[in-house]
Amino acid sequence: MKYVIMLAIVVGLAIADFVTGIIKAAINRDISSQKMRIGGLHKIMELLVMTTACGLEIGIRELGKYYQAPQLAEIAGAFAAGAVFAYILSMEIISILENYVEANPEAKWAAGIVKKLRVFQQQKEKEEHNDSADQQSGEG
């Protein structure tokens, strides 16, 4: 049952993100069928990734029973599905907030949240880029 709930939440947030994106585009007079098609395909991929993570959790749990390590397998599987779920959940909520801010620039509370999240994201990307550059320079 928890998988159905997780998938329902992901589907609900994906639909909300898609709809807020359409509303934002309509308000900004920037409706594009290509963007809608690509956005819809991204949402389908998110659902497939979440479904795969749920299947992975089930598979790892069953494999743990076979190898006499059910608790360890259950923790590993739950972590995998939970991590994917948390990532998709946060990504969708951030996207919905971004759509809201772009459609309604007067929403200062949401704009502040989005601004902080963008700074955090840029710092993380910069750190990842630096780590990648360090690894490449160490290999040469």
What is each PLM-predicted segment?
Residues 4-7, 44-45, 77-88, 94, ...:
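Alpha-helical transmembrane segments of integral membrane proteins
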Residues 8-26:
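N-terminal signal-anchor/start-transfer transmembrane helix
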Residues 20-24, 50, 98-102:
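Alpha-helical transmembrane segments and their lipid-water interface positions
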Residues 32-46:
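Juxtamembrane helix-capping/reentrant segments at transmembrane boundaries
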Residues 42-61:
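A generic, lipid-embedded transmembrane alpha helix
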Residues 55-91:
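Mid-chain, well-packed structural core segment of small domains
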Residues 90-140:
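Membrane-proximal cytosolic segments adjacent to transmembrane helices
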